[in-house]
Amino acid sequence: VEAAGGIILVPNKLSLQFFKPVDAGGTVLHSMQYSKDVLEADVFISFPILKHHNGTGLTMGLKNMMGLVWDRGFFHRTDLHRTIAECAAFKKPDLVIMDAVRGITTHGPMGPGTIREYNQLVFCTDPVAVEAYGAELFGDKP
């Protein structure tokens, strides 16, 4: 991947040196330390998996953006839903590829949870549409 000019990010294991302070422009999320690599990338592809989340109900294309922020604890301490929305609005991926081959339908994100086969990969340029489609797969109204 790197020889072809790409990078592999593992945000949970990165130090603060890989993040850049940015003005998030939100009403709750005013500023944040955001992934430098994503900010500087020519193309930004998000690859969430379809899963249940105890705090948000679902975690897919929008909540996935939290992984690009240094202090994710702020989201949980403040207003989880609003900060997720404001973070997702800050920098939208060029493409979202949701792995919905199998979905974790209960006790996410840590599990163990119930696994259901959906046998789908979802490709879209709109992370909100991916979220809505995933909610429908889970039987929820978006």
How should these model regions be labeled?
Residues 1-142:
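N-terminal and secondary-structure boundary signal
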